[in-house]
Amino acid sequence: MAARCVRLARRSLPALALSFRPSPRLLCTATKQKNNGQNLDEDLGHCEPKTDPPSADKTLLEEKAKLEEQLRETMEKYKRALADTENLRQRSQKLVEEAKLYGIQGFCKDLLEVADILEKATQSVPKEEISNNNPHLKSLYEGLVMTEVQIQKVFTKHGLLRLDPIGAKFDPYEHEALFHTPVEGKEPGTVALVSKVGYKLHGRTLRPALVGVVKDA
């Protein structure tokens, strides 16, 4: 009896094994589900936000801004240097021109002494003695006058002008007051007497005129 039961059990084992073996269709479906799960995970992984590095356009814009700032600073420095150079050129040119104009001041002052002597010489000659009866004195006087006129022409040619301000308003930049005195019929503050004429060189007072000024009585 026992041996019969054993034989029946051996015969039933293959059938039971087949009943528990999964079918190919089920295996294929499981494989597809597994693959779909992996693909879904990969898709979800691709959808995760990522931090991108700075783009090339942004870098180029930053470099452009830096270069523009450097260019602006360089242009400002260039303009300042150009302005400084122009100012220096103008100052140098002005100094050269002033040296040309006023470099002869010392020489002119020496010539003024000669002009003063000529003026005093012509003024010292008695006018009543200048006649044909005294030809030597007349010739000498006329020679002095011609020399004085000629030297004044030379002065004018080189920008040296004579100041004889008799009757003019007193100007402290051109006149030097030796005294103040009331003068009848004269306006106070005007020049009543010129003791020594003055001179201007190219508009600048070289020697002030020595004068007497009218004051209120």
Swiss-Prot record:
Q: Where does the record place the modification N6-succinyllysine?
A: K94, K120, K215
State the Pfam families in the record. Answer: GrpE
Instruction: List GO BP terms, alphabetically.
Output: protein folding
Assigned GO CC terms: mitochondrial matrix; mitochondrion; nucleoplasm
- State the CDD domains in the record: GrpE
User: What InterPro entries does the record point to?
Assistant: GrpE (IPR000740), GrpE_coiled_coil (IPR013805), GrpE_head (IPR009012)
The job of this chain, per UniProt, is described as: Essential component of the PAM complex, a complex required for the translocation of transit peptide-containing proteins from the inner membrane into the mitochondrial matrix in an ATP-dependent manner. Seems to control the nucleotide-dependent binding of mitochondrial HSP70 to substrate proteins.
Subunit and partners: Probable component of the PAM complex at least composed of a mitochondrial HSP70 protein, GRPEL1 or GRPEL2, TIMM44, TIMM16/PAM16 and TIMM14/DNAJC19. Binds to HSP70, HSC70 and HSJ1B.
The name this protein carries in UniProt is GrpE protein homolog 1, mitochondrial
Organism source for this protein?
Mus musculus (Mouse)
The taxonomy runs:
Eukaryota, Metazoa, Chordata, Craniata, Vertebrata
Q: Which gene encodes it?
A: Grpel1
